[in-house]
Amino acid sequence: MSAVAGALRELLVRYLDAWTPVALHSARGATFAYGWSDSPDEHAAEAAVRVFAEFADRLRGRRLTVVLVGPAPATLARRLDTVQAELRTPPELSVHAVEGDLDARLPAALKAAGAAVAPLLAFLDSAGPASLAAAGTGKPAEVLLVSGTGQLPTPPMPLTAHVELVGGDGAARLVTFATTVGKGLEAFKNALWAVDEYAGVRYRDPRDPEGHLLDISLSPHPGPLRRELLAHLASAGPRTVTDLRQFTLTHTVYRAADTVRVLSALLTAGTVTRDPERGRLGGDVVIALS
């Protein structure tokens, strides 16, 4: 297992820990889809089922459907059957495998699972536009897409975040998270920065022209966010703290909560000003370049 793959699996698990209890509040149940274009990461799929098993008490009267789509899914399906038998998962947690090309088969597989009327999270590896469109049919809909670096994918959801995971050898994978709900994006960012360090794996913002590498930390280095906030203020003019928190959440790899920490340092340095000049740095405070 490569260090980047290990970090990706932990990111998935940490996000599922947040997504699953919320999704299971839906009276219509929920769907988790795992799709791949080449070969599946069996460890990641097993880890997902183990997370779901931890919430077995919340499955009474609700369903959680796991849909596997891609070439040669039989071995993975058998492995997950074994895991379910080991954990004695309830019948409300079901696994369905569909063999074939991901983009060709995922739309029909999700329709058959009733994914369009309930929470849907799709974990996709190297998926194309058809798969992303299908993943956008849930209510709410979320996708965690892993792909090669380069052109940024454009899922149909309105809230999107991109981050590259870079190994010590320079090998990198692009992770794109997209959702229809703001709380989902916040939960993803929290999971992103809570991942344990993996043998030199670091993050990189694909939209950062300087390509700075960031150590994974609950208190990430603020330098790139500082530059991005200053550039945004220079181009957009004065903005409220709420506006800047939203910018951080949707246009950087950082969490919204990191915004206030950076703004406080900029105010102390005299780089920016605030209106009103005193008091708590609340959401309605207006920030401008000095």
List PLM regions with ranges.
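S-adenosyl-L-methionine
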Residues: 1-61, 77-118, 242, 253-272, 276-285, ...
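Hydrophobic beta-strand segments of well-ordered beta-sheets in folded domains
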Residues: 30-33, 62-69, 93-96, 118-122, ...
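Conserved phosphate-coordination/catalytic loops
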Residues: 6, 10, 100-101, 220-223
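Membrane helical hairpin/interfacial module
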Residues: 51-82
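A short acidic (Asp/Glu
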Residues: 41-49, 75-82, 131-134, 189, ...
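Conserved proline-anchored active-site loop of SAM-dependent methyltransferases
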Residues: 30-45, 70, 116-131, 178
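Class I S-adenosyl-L-methionine
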Residues: 107-120, 126-276, 280-289
